[in-house]
Amino acid sequence: MSVLTLKARAGADDVDALMREIGRQARAAARRMALVSGQQKDRGLRAAAAAIRAAAPAILEANRADLTEARAKDLPAATLDRLELTPARVEAIAAAVEAIAGLPDPVGRRLAAFERPNGLSIERIATPLGVVGVIFESRPNVTADAGALCLKAGNAAVLRAGSESLRSAAAIAAAMTEGLVAEGLPADAIQLVPTRDRAAVGAMLSGLDGCIDVIVPRGGKNLVARVQNEAKVPVFAHLEGICHVFVHAAADLAMARTIVRNSKLRRTGICGAAETLLVDRACASTHLAPLVLDLLEAGCAVRGDEATRAVDPRVTPASEADWRTEYLDAVIAVRVVEGLDAAIDHIETFGSHHTDAIVTHDTGAAERFLAEVDSAIVVHNASTQFADGGEFGFGAEIGIATGRMHARGPVGVEQLTTFKYRVHGSGQIRP
């Protein structure tokens, strides 16, 4: 039974029943997906990509309706940009699904193998997580990215789009389902929640009677905070990306300038953008002014401590709140610190455990930074904006996680698996 048929049957007032049925269908699909070969999954994904291309006119028509409604609600320009689809963006969505099909199958990998003295042979094998719930806001492309990643890892996906992107997401999901079914995969392997009712989010966070194994939120801070606070199942997420670049005393100035500019300004609105620059006092006399002036001349507002404000009158005073702020804009906080220990302490106090970088030619300082900074991604002599599954060679990512359990850093297809132990014996019994 399709989700849209179910919606008509359940009625708008029975969201709980709707969601429970979606959960049961997803669990049944997950059991089937766990046994599907890698070749069949890839054929299904390539068929889904072809179906997205074929459905481009319908997808764009649905998107125009979403955009019309969003403009009538006077939503911000940034939201409209994330929501808008063009023929090129639809093609990029299809190409991303094909790229996921081209990744190695993460299921069935032998992660470890050993033999016990009693002759038992034990191996640890990668297996699907089961059912992944994804809650996202205005980006309709997440429908395809998340659905394809989950399916590649042998999972079923329950997707809940933001109300502003529901028509676009539904058109993409319908095309994907058409492709999957054509290759013999279950229609319920990727289900889009067909209602704007916010109660559907609460139902997903409850776990749908054990049918959802993990939740991944893709959106703003308020959404992520709600998911982290209310979910009764594990969550792969990060609340904020308060990323730091520390320019150590042994940093090459030319390298530091290019890394700082790229970390902050390549794209200011992504979670891997640097929000705070820390400069070692031991090199501040030579490094601080060029770094700050580069940022100012590039149009970046600088909020600094006393030493930083002395560089240029355009630098405004930094408050305590600035060290804790994810600007997602052309704004950066700059502080001079008393060496490596102070930099690590600052990051531990104000950071979000996302991505932090050190620029230095001192191998010992770099190793200490990489060992002691407790972030999902720690970087030596490179931009924080490499915090991305594609840049890690994972293909697409479903998000970046900063928790300490299971998935951490970019969450790609391998992170959407778990494992089981297979134990082979020859009649052994335990004494």
UniProtKB/Swiss-Prot annotation:
Biological-process GO terms, alphabetical: L-proline biosynthetic process
Database matches in PROSITE patterns: PROA
Gene Ontology MF: a single term: NADP binding
Subcellular location(s) of the protein: Cytoplasm
Cited SUPFAM superfamilies: ALDH-like
Tagged with keyword Transcription: no
PANTHER family referenced in this protein's UniProt entry, alphabetically: DELTA-1-PYRROLINE-5-CARBOXYLATE SYNTHASE, GLUTAMATE SEMIALDEHYDE DEHYDROGENASE
Name under which the protein is recorded: Gamma-glutamyl phosphate reductase
